[in-house]
Every structure is written in structure tokens, then in C-alpha cells.
Amino acid sequence: MSVTLEKLQEMWEKDSKIDRDNLHEESLNIPSLHAKYFELYNTIFLLRKKAEQQRKNIRHERYEYFSGKADPDVYIENPFPKKIRDKDTMQKYLDADEKLSNTSLKIDYYDTMLAYIESILKVIQNRTFQIKNAIEFMRFNSGLG
């Protein structure tokens, strides 16, 4: 299940609406909504873990490359005339490396999605109270409360 942040926002825009005429059904729908978004959370959490491992692997690969310790065949395809030994210089090269940056951006994207889903799950957990308050307000307006 691959979902983008935009798709996630569209899904929540639709799912967040509470039908005032069917509060009983909305109440019964809470567990399935929670399951839906918790499944998404777990999937994205695992994708983030995978991306973290990829970043570690790429960082090691690029460190070897920039320090001149990579397999000689690598330099035939992609020559690098320097051998970086200084820690600060190495960090600058790693920070500027496109492969490493792309993986870091992917992790940041997953973090944004996870934070968004966490906020959705909090709203879903409070939905029972929202529905209860809506029912009490309807009773009050009809003179029953």
C-alpha cells in the first residue's frame, strides 16, 4: 500500500466529516477508521525504517568512495581524483551528496506523514466525545436536555 501525503490528506478530508443525521453509524465506524489509519501508520513507519537503513548503507558506500577506499571498479565508472581524509571535509562532501540527500529527504517525507497520521489518530480517538457532544446539543436544542 503506497500512499502519498496528498492522497492521505484527501482521504482524511473525506473521512473526517461526521454525518449529523447518522451519528449512530458514525459512532460504529470509529474502530474501522482507527484501523485504517493505524495500518497506514505502521506501513509508513516500516518504510521509514527501511529508508533509514538505506541511508546508512549509502552513507557507508559514499564514505568509502570519497575516502578512496571503494572498489577500484567504482572509480573506473565514476572517477573521483581526490582522497578525502579530513573529517570536516568528508562531512561537507557527504552533506552535498545527491544519493544521500535524496534518502534523507525521503525520511523527512515519511516523518511528515507519520506526524499527520498521529494527529488523525488523536482526532479519531476523540471522535466518541465529539459525537456524544453533538447528541447532547441536539437534545438541548429539542428541549430534552
Predicted regions and their residues:
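Charge-rich amphipathic alpha-helical interaction elements
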Residues: M1-G145
